[in-house]
Amino acid sequence: MFGKIVFLLLVALCAGVQSRYLIVSEPVYYIEHYEEPELLASSRVRRDAHGALTLNSDGTSGAVVKVPFAGNDKNIVSAIGSVDLTDRQKLGAATAGVALDNINGHGLSLTDTHIPGFGDKMTAAGKVNVFHNDNHDITAKAFATRNMPDIANVPNFNTVGGGIDYMFKDKIGASASAAHTDFINRNDYSLDGKLNLFKTPDTSIDFNAGFKKFDTPFMKSSWEPNFGFSLSKYF
């Protein structure tokens, strides 16, 4: 039943991508994509509190925590929170919410993000682990976001997206994602890879690299490279 619910969510959202925050830069609105830390991308549920730190090539950084507080032998409910810093080490976004993770790798989450100078956004997201064995893991993800700007004459608007993640032996991974915002008729795309550099039962260090681009009726970007490192820790 849980898997069917998540599957219906994926269909309704047209398959999703992970997107942290929306920034407004006059006169162009744009969506900034990011890679979730490993603790949120893991396809196998754990019952430990855990956190992650990320450092990116553009100078931005972030921290995220996930603390289980309820559940049974199949499903775990956790409180989640994160803080993102700009390349000038100022607050870029702060997020809080709840997540439901299933032992088979499926999941749901509901979060609220506050972006200084912009406003808030509410995001509902889901993931379905479509294949898993000792060597391969494939997960499809979806999200829908209601953006609520605190800016004069800018209405609330929606962003939806989708993506798929692949991992080989918990060592090498790849992902592809896309997002669409009707209000500005903008599409965002990203292709990413991950390499695990160090791993113990409670600690993981990963290298992430990829390319991203966007297009609107008025302008398009080229594929822009990005890379970073993440440290995940279970407690």
From Swiss-Prot:
Acetylation recorded as keyword: no
Name of the featured protein: Attacin-E
UniProt entry keywords in alphabetical sequence: Antibiotic, Antimicrobial, Cleavage on pair of basic residues, Immunity, Innate immunity, Repeat, Secreted, Signal
Chain positions listed as propeptide in the UniProt record: 20-47
Domain of life: Eukaryota
UniProt miscellaneous comment: There are six forms of attacin that are divided into two groups: acidic (E and F) and basic (A, B, C, and D).
Keyword match Coiled coil: no
GO biological process assignments: defense response to bacterium; innate immune response
Annotated signal sequence range: 1-19
Post-translational modification: Attacin F appears to be derived by proteolytic digestion of attacin E.
InterPro entries: Attacin_C (IPR005521), Attacin_N (IPR005520)
Record's GO cellular component terms: extracellular region
Pfam families: Attacin_C, Attacin_N
Family: Belongs to the attacin/sarcotoxin-2 family.
Subcellular localization, as worded in the UniProt entry: Secreted
Function: Hemolymph antibacterial protein.
